[in-house]
């Protein structure tokens, strides 16, 4: 190999972090915010929908489950597709799918139609999450990657806050259909903007297109006001065929199984609580307006959780941050269950929200770093798929929380234990990825 050639990571270090990555983070982040709105809208609208259509507890659980079934299929399909034909197709298509079907949901004539449309909305959302993380991670220098991947997750909190705020303003005055319609508009706008982002240069290089990869890197350098050295990119030999079964091959099996455990448990705990949160408050005797006010307060607590995790993943490392935040999530979920007044429920809920969403951010930072380029999208898609399985289970399990009003100790204890199991899994991860370059092949890990 020519001694004057440079690796992809050396090239990324040369172009640096600047306007291009900031623009990409905002574009990815706004898509994430739009997706967060779509995922949690039904939980915010559920009391109003149930009242209008007279839904049973089982029907409410099915409606909450629908989007996660779509997200499971979407995560597996789009994650795999992004490793085969590139990140760009899924990056653009997924946000269009979830926004179009999200808008159509506002016009659902019946319960069955609403379930079907929310499932299709989930198919788009399920692809956006893993594809966005893969493409953004592949544009980042190693020393900034963890912090900015967690900050990207902060946009999810902005979406939750926006959804809670819109529900507070719209549902009591105009009804749930207007909430669904208004919330779909941002995604349609973001779809148009996303088309200008080029394909991942790392993907291009791994797939034998060094000229195209260099052209993209030169674009990044010009945007950032830097210069790419006049040296050829060192080819990356793909020695690991892309395929889901490769995630369980020796060298990756332990990491994959532990990551799947964490994704499953954090999703079960998070959606088990938050899908039903407005309904929990309603069951305590709150009127509709205070329900949305308290939900909005808990949503606000997510932002500082993300920002603290963004700092600690670089200061402490990915693994200890994950373990601490997941364990703390479990502790405060139990205290949330044991609280005997609305004020204490809200106070413990704030800390639960803080730590849970910080854990999400750290997990999204670690997972794409755990896999080589040829498997990164597939790995993210498979891991994300486990959240869709537990997310689909959580609403039905959460239906039990409505029995007996605020007597929520047993089911919420299950969710608390789920978080703690995830924290234990984090301690078993074999690799710390802080400040390390992304691997392109399994042999390079």
Segment roles from a protein language model:
Residues 1-445:
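Transmembrane-helix signature of 12-pass secondary carriers
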């Amino acid at each position: 190999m020519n001694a004057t050639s440079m690796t992809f990571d050396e090239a990324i270090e040369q172009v640096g972090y600047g306007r291009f990555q900031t623009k990409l983070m905002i574009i990815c982040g706004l898509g994430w915010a739009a997706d967060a709105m779509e995922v949690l809208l039904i939980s915010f609208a559920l009391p109003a929908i149930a009242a209008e259509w007279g839904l049973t507890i089982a029907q409410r659980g099915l409606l909450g489950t629908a989007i996660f079934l779509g997200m499971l299929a979407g995560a597996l399909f789009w994650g795999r597709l992004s490793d085969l034909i590139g990140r760009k197709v899924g990056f653009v298509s997924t946000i269009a799918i979830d926004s179009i079907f999200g808008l159509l949901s506002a016009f659902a004539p019946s319960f069955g139609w609403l379930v079907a449309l929310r499932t299709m909305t989930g198919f788009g959302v399920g692809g956006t999450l893993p594809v966005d993380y893969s493409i953004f991670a592949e544009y980042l220098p190693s020393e900034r990657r963890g912090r900015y991947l967690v900050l990207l997750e902060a946009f999810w909190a902005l979406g939750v806050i926006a959804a809670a705020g819109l529900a507070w303003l719209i549902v009591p005055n105009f009804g749930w259909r207007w909430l669904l319609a208004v919330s779909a508009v941002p995604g349609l706008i973001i779809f148009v903007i996303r088309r200008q982002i080029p394909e991942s240069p790392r993907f291009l290089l791994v797939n034998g297109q060094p000229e195209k990869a260099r052209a993209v890197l030169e674009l990044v350098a010009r945007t950032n006001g830097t210069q790419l050295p006049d040296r050829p990119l060192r080819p990356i030999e793909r020695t690991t065929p892309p395929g889901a079964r490769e995630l369980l091959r020796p060298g990756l099996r332990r990491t994959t199984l532990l990551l799947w455990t964490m994704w499953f448990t954090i999703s079960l705990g998070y959606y088990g609580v938050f899908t039903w949160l407005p309904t929990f408050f309603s069951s305590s005797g709150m009127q509709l307006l205070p329900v949305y006010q308290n939900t909005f307060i808990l949503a606000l607590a997510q932002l500082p959780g993300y920002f603290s995790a963004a700092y600690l993943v670089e200061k402490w490392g990915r693994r200890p941050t994950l373990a601490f935040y997941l364990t703390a999530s479990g502790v405060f979920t139990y205290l949330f269950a044991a609280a005997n007044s609305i004020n204490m429920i809200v106070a413990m809920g704030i800390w639960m929200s803080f730590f849970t969403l910080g854990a999400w951010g750290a997990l999204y930072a670690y997972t794409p770093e755990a896999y080589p380029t040829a498997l990164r999208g597939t790995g993210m898609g498979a891991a994300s798929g486990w959240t869709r399985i537990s997310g689909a289970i959580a609403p039905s399990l959460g239906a039990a929380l409505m029995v007996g009003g605020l007597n929520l100790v047993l089911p919420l204890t299950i969710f608390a234990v789920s978080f703690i199991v995830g924290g234990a899994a984090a301690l078993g991860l074999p690799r710390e990825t802080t400040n390390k370059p992304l691997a392109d092949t399994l042999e390079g890990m």
